[in-house]
């Protein structure tokens, strides 16, 4: 909503989004933790620079549930790295939804890693490790079975910094926008170089959320 004072407009925060009916189906047993996380993100997210002022009005559908849709694709008992975790999207949401998975949240900014540690503690999550680092600096923490990322960068930039974190045969799980097919085409040489194969783009949340969630899913083969 725009508010005008002496002809100058500025954006004002909308009210918090009400919990959608789809939250129960998507989060299941983790619904209460999802509610607590969402409430904390609404309360602190804008002040800490984790989400923009307009995102409060769509925090459930565009952020929390969008992230939680990836949970069924995680390997049971596996190790997951979330690159550029920021507010914990998708990594912290996946950690609360899948307590059987060890999740490492990789984030270079101190105020964000402070938030991630504090929020993990508030939620009582014991399967989370927070690592203040760039992806390129996090290789010693691996190898991981899977790597996630959301709103970090285009594939041609993202693949070279994430593929080295994986074990041979590990998976890339990236939340992407409507132009993901164009990104795949633009990254063809990079994908070949890093032995990325079995590429699929899955549309998640159809009929559950207002916007389709696109998941780029691929396997990283063994190095020669």
Task: List each language-model region with its residue ranges.
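Class I SAM-dependent transferase core
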Residues: 1-81, 97, 111-128
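Compositionally biased, intrinsically disordered/low-complexity regions enriched for serine, proline
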Residues: 11-13, 17, 87, 105, ...
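Short hydrophobic/aromatic-rich motifs at helix boundaries and adjacent loops
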Residues: 38-43, 88-89, 130-131, 157-160
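Conserved beta-strand/loop positions that form the S-adenosyl-L-methionine
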Residues: 83-85
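S-adenosylmethionine
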Residues: 98-224
């Amino acid at each position: 909503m725009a508010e005008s004072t002496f002809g100058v407009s500025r954006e004002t925060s909308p009210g918090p989004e009400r919990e959608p009916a789809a939250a129960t189906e998507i989060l299941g047993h983790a619904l209460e933790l999802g509610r607590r996380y969402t409430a904390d993100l609404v309360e602190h997210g804008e002040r800490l620079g984790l989400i923009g002022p307009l995102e409060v009005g769509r925090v459930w559908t565009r952020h929390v549930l969008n992230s939680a849709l990836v949970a069924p694709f995680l390997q049971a008992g596996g190790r997951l790295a979330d690159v550029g975790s920021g507010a914990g999207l998708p990594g912290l949401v996946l950690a609360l939804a899948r307590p059987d998975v060890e999740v490492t949240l990789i984030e270079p900014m101190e105020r964000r890693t402070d938030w991630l540690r504090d929020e993990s503690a508030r939620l009582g999550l014991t399967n989370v490790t927070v690592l203040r680092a760039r992806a390129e600096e996090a290789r010693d923490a691996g190898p991981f079975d899977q790597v996630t990322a959301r709103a970090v960068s285009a594939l041609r930039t993202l693949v070279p910094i994430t593929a080295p974190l994986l074990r041979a045969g590990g998976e890339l799980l990236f939340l992407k926008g409507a132009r993901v097919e164009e990104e795949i085409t633009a990254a063809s040489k990079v994908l070949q170089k890093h032995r990325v194969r079995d590429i699929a783009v899955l549309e998640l949340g159809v009929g559950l959320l207002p916007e389709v969630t696109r998941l780029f899913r691929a396997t990283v083969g063994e190095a020669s």
